[in-house]
A protein has these predicted regions:
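A short glycine-rich, Lys/Arg-flanked "PGG" loop and its adjoining helix->strand segment in the class I
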Residues: 138-153
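A short acidic, Gly/Pro-enriched loop at the edge of an enzyme's catalytic core
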Residues: 108-124
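Class I SAM-dependent methyltransferase SAM/SAH-binding core
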Residues: 55-109
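Short alpha-helix
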Residues: 192-213
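Conserved class I S-adenosyl-L-methionine
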Residues: 1-45, 47-56, 59, 63, 155-181
Length: 239
């Protein structure tokens, strides 16, 4: 089996963190995608306590803080988190932003005896393919449910999985990773850095989060490679 550390998303983002923003900014479509997610989030989240899950370098903090949210910022990559901290310090905002540390940013550490936040959430944002870095969405669903109040809005953008296109382009990589125990996945490469990308279909995402979050809707964001999902926390308690 391939060395899993080699394809670890956290390690990948640590290594590319210094050029992440410039890479993202080089494609003007990314700002349009972020803007659409922003407007959708603001339209649907009425409470004031939110989680920016997998927040990267803090790009979404600008508008979250600007709209008066109390924000828990969760980013497991140290390199990305350090850049986000610099960006937070440069924000001219009175909004309360809680930067979660390395241990708290790992959702696998969350449980009933180790709640990473002080207030239950009204909204959760997971933007720009955060879920595609995570294999076990069922565990993530339970952990997010643990820290969410009833009717918390969970809004997430993930890679839109086009089976035909992916198989025609990445079939050999997909087969190799599947046989190595990664499940349905491909990989991306930036210089010498590689990262696993888990391919979650629309039906799988809806089914996986359905235990604790009711499905509201999903749609493709403009003509991009992203799909937006909207879920609503139900009453089911996490066992």
């Amino acid at each position: 089996m391939r060395n899993k550390q080699e394809l670890d998303p956290v390690k990948y983002y640590d290594n590319i963190s210094s050029k992440y923003d410039s890479t993202l900014n080089s494609n003007s479509d990314n700002s349009k995608i972020r803007d659409e997610v922003k407007h959708y989030f603001l339209k649907n989240v009425s409470g004031k306590i939110v989680l920016d899950f997998g927040g990267g370098t803090g790009k979404d903090l600008i508008w979250l803080a600007g709209n008066g949210f109390k924000i828990y910022f969760c980013e497991p990559s140290k390199g990305m988190r350090e850049i986000a901290l610099k960006n937070i310090k440069s924000l001219k905002s009175t909004a309360e932003i809680i930067l979660m540390d390395e241990l708290s940013s790992n959702f696998h550490n969350w449980n009933k005896n180790n709640i990473p936040i002080d207030n239950k959430l009204d909204g959760i944002l997971a933007n720009f393919a955060v879920l595609n870095s995570i294999k076990d969405l069922e565990d993530l669903s339970a952990k997010l449910a643990l820290i969410s109040r009833k009717n918390c809005r969970f809004i997430v953008s993930v890679l839109n999985v086009n089976i035909k296109r992916i198989f025609s382009r990445d079939l050999s990589v997909i087969l190799r990773l599947f046989l190595s125990g990664y499940g349905f996945a491909t990989q991306i490469k930036e210089g010498n850095n590689k990262m696993i990308v888990y391919l979650h279909t629309e039906s799988n995402i809806i089914k996986t989060f359905g235990k604790y979050f009711n499905y509201v809707e999903s749609f493709r964001i403009q003509k991009s490679s992203f799909r937006l999902f909207h879920f609503l926390r139900n009453e089911k308690e996490v066992v």
